[in-house]
């Protein structure tokens, strides 16, 4: 990407220098290891208390991340990443692969030579390399604000969440009956985080010239960022419907270039992979099916278009027996036939401008 090469050092028993992460081998080996397992549905949740935005922004200004690996060239702006994996260990909501998801995504980004200058990793498993803290509600809100704070043109942001997703009754939203929610590890005590608040903290104030890519591997995630454009297919009685980027909301326009890839539709559950032998010959690890397929596409050597990335991910899931359908939405009408990239501004479909 832009000629940059990462020179990360290894972690764990092979650590060469503290503070440097190498997850390329983890991500590659992970693909040797998936059969669908049933995700426990949390059920609709009560709306949480409203976020204290002033306190959240103040805490964000006191926060910082770390550089995960060395890069050979300096990007034009800051390149920040926030990775959240929640397994809910020893609870009724327990999942088994969400922390694997974020390690696999970080490894895929490293293999693509994505020049991260600062990252934060929130995980409820202590053995995740570079872990910043636990994915509590307060921490997630704090670092969502950290990711977006003081963003300037040419900055590149990346966000990944793997965990439970659920719904709460919508409030003051003419477009939806429900609000989608992500689920912190302490949701029983402190509640979920609704999509309106994620949009307000992470997206709404980003200036023109900033690029954000967000991945949500969770149930009910199709419109998690409430973005105005999405890839949709029109159905027709004769089966000749058309597919493309179309405006799905008349509000929530933002200046930044924001891309969201979500594991499934708002009314679907996101499945996990317990043992990836459905994808490859052997293995034992677990993780989110959408993350698994998406990172597999991202790590391919040949170039992909935006549409290729989405369609191939969908096809890979379907061919292995998964029923969920990943979604793509954006702040602007992306020209999906252009080459996929995590950096730079979107090539736009002029007919929708």
Swiss-Prot record:
Location relative to the cell: Cell projection, Cilium, Flagellum membrane; Secreted
Organism: Trypanosoma brucei brucei
Consequence of substituting residue 2 to A: Loss of flagellum membrane localization. No defect in MCA4 secretion, however processing of the secreted form is impaired. No defect in growth rate and virulence in infected mice
Gene Ontology CC annotations of this record: ciliary membrane; cytoplasm; extracellular vesicle; motile cilium; nucleus
Gene name of the record: MCA4
InterPro entries: Caspase-like_dom_sf, Metacaspase, Pept_C14_caspase
Pfam families xrefs: Peptidase_C14
Deletion phenotype: Knockouts in the bloodstream form have an initial slower growth rate in vitro which reaches wild-type levels after several weeks of culture. Knockouts in the bloodstream form have a reduced growth rate and virulence in infected mice. RNAi-mediated knockdown at the bloodstream stage results in a more severe phenotype characterized by a growth arrest due to a failure to undergo cytokinesis.
Topology with respect to the bilayer: Lipid-anchor
Broad class of the protein's primary localization: membrane
Site (Cleavage): 64-65
Record carries keyword Membrane: yes
N-myristoyl glycine lipid attachment residues: 2
Entry's family note: Belongs to the peptidase C14B family.
Modification after translation (UniProt): Palmitoylated.
Protein name per Swiss-Prot or TrEMBL: Inactive metacaspase-4
Record function comment: Inactive metacaspase which plays a role in parasite bloodstream form growth and in parasite virulence within the mammalian host.
GO BP terms: proteolysis
One example GO MF annotation: peptidase activity
